[in-house]
Amino acid sequence: MIKYQKLTENELDTFIKMRIQQLREEGATEDIDLVPALHDYYSRHMADGTFVSWLAMDGDRIVGTSGMSFVEKPPYFGCPNGRIGLLSSMFTDPDYRRMGIAKELLSRVINEARDYGCGTVQITASDMGVLLYTDFGFVKNNNFMHYKLQQT
């Protein structure tokens, strides 16, 4: 039976391995070791309350992950308080897919964003995740753009 719990430091190493597995599945190019940066990010933001994750557990095994980062930007009409949830780290072990785990994890982190006071939640969805998010009620925003900064 699948049980759900919040991520703690105890599960962080496995959570990071699953995050990297997710990025690989999505076709990311591995040109650096992300483990130290991920560990630093999650540790700092879990401690200050600006990152939360729910896990799906089969016994002691993590079989699904989710993540919500909380950011604030100047208020705008679509989000008058400026608080935004950034959804990430949505991953389900391939052996556990199509069992409703991702939907349950999504619901739990959406509730976390609501409790934090976010006016909107954003995600850059993988091709595999689009149906989950649209079924949940997410809508595409064709205005989203990004610019990659070169580090000097």
Where does each model-flagged region fall?
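Conserved GNAT-fold acetyl-CoA-binding loop/helix
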Residues: 20-42, 82
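A short helix-loop-beta-strand connector motif used in the catalytic cores of GNAT acetyltransferases and
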Residues: 43-55, 86
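Conserved beta-strand-loop-alpha-helix junction that forms the acyl-donor binding cleft
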Residues: 121-131, 146-151
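Conserved beta-strand in the GNAT
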Residues: 55, 61-70, 86, 91
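Conserved GNAT acetyl-CoA-binding A-motif
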Residues: 106, 113-125
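Conserved acetyl-CoA pyrophosphate-binding loop and the N-cap/start of the following alpha-helix
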Residues: 96, 100-108
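Conserved acetyl-CoA binding element of GNAT-fold acetyltransferases
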Residues: 78-94, 143-146
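A short beta-loop-alpha structural element at the N-terminal edge
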Residues: 3-17
